[in-house]
Amino acid sequence: MSSTTLYPAWKQAVRVLLDEGLTFGTTVTRKRLAELCQVKSPVDVDDVRRYDLELLTCITEIKDTLLTAHCMLLVSDNKGAYVVIAPESQTAYAVDTGVKAIGREMKKMAMAVSFTKTELLTDTDRAKNADAQAKISMLAGMLKVQNKELVKIAHKDPQ
């Protein structure tokens, strides 16, 4: 009896990875994920964008499925591969990456609001801009305190 092939390809890729023994600490190369997702290699420079987009879509679906259906966090090792984070490290990893991402986005928002040509604004728009800057500053302060608390909790050793 033959086994059923799942569609789209990322569903089959998840099944194959689990059947091959994917577990915490396992590393999977980007090339292997491309093979499992049946993403055709680019034939020329113009085709690279298609390849990257297809592969990114497939990897994102695999990561989401592994996390939500199997409680396995698959993350990039920044060396061309992906690794399944061990459960005891998952909270700290999630908090650390989340805090960094929030910080980056807060900085982008603050800069966009701060570097506005206020001399070209109406009085009403200038007041809105000043109010937004004040609120963003207040929010950044609150986030800083909460982020520190989160990091402490995530890295606290159990007694």
Describe each PLM feature range:
Residues 110-159:
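Exposed, interaction-prone assembly regions rather than primary DNA-binding/catalytic cores
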Residues 1-25:
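Short alpha-helical segments that sit at the start of domains
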Residues 89-112:
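Short, amphipathic alpha-helical interaction segments positioned at domain boundaries
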Residues 23-49:
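Short acidic, hydrophobic short linear motifs in intrinsically disordered regions
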Residues 75-86:
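Minor-groove-contacting beta-hairpin "wing" of winged helix-turn-helix DNA-binding domains
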Residues 49-65:
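Short amphipathic alpha-helical interaction segments
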Residues 63, 67-77:
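A short, conserved structural fragment
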